[in-house]
């Protein structure tokens, strides 16, 4: 299997499968996928370029903050959006509010807004990052 074939295979995985893959790799190689924490504060002048980069951002992550009173309805919408199975969608919805409760990652602004609209219509709450 070439690296290109491996990348294509990974692209075809669901969010739940990717999370499981990361967990397996962490266990197998004894590493952590957590980002290192910056020890020093950034310089004041460095804030301006990051603000400009945020305006040009073309890839967004949709994070589930809460499922509200209609958990079952939110699960149905999450399944529709992600293509996850019932158990995986339920597990994702039950993680609402966690730092890794992403419905979708790396989507365009229009798609992120559409996901937010669908989830809020059934009583859920999302954050677009």
UniProtKB/Swiss-Prot annotation:
GO terms for cellular component: cytosolic large ribosomal subunit. Keywords: Ribonucleoprotein, Ribosomal protein. GO terms for biological process: translation. It comes from the Bacteria. InterPro entries: Ribosomal_bL12, Ribosomal_bL12_C, Ribosomal_bL12_C/ClpS-like, Ribosomal_bL12_oligo, Ribosomal_bL12_oligo_N_sf. GO terms for molecular function: mRNA binding; structural constituent of ribosome. Pfam families: Ribosomal_L12 (PF00542), Ribosomal_L12_N (PF16320). Homodimer. Part of the ribosomal stalk of the 50S ribosomal subunit. Forms a multimeric L10(L12)X complex, where L10 forms an elongated spine to which 2 to 4 L12 dimers bind in a sequential fashion. Binds GTP-bound translation factors. Belongs to the bacterial ribosomal protein bL12 family. This is Large ribosomal subunit protein bL12. It comes from Fervidobacterium nodosum (strain ATCC 35602 / DSM 5306 / Rt17-B1). The gene is rplL.
């Amino acid at each position: 299997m070439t690296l290109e074939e491996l990348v294509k295979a990974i692209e075809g995985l669901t969010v739940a499968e990717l999370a499981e893959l990361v967990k397996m790799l962490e266990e197998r190689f004894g590493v952590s996928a957590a980002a290192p924490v910056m020890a020093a504060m950034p310089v004041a002048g460095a804030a301006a370029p990051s603000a400009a980069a945020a305006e040009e951002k073309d890839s967004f992550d949709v994070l589930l903050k809460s499922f509200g009173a209609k958990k079952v309805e939110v699960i149905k919408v999450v399944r529709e959006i992600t293509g996850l199975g019932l158990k995986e969608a339920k597990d994702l919805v039950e993680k609402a509010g966690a730092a890794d409760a992403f419905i979708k990652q790396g989507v365009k602004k229009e798609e992120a807004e559409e996901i937010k609209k669908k989830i809020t219509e059934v009583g859920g709450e999302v954050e677009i990052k």
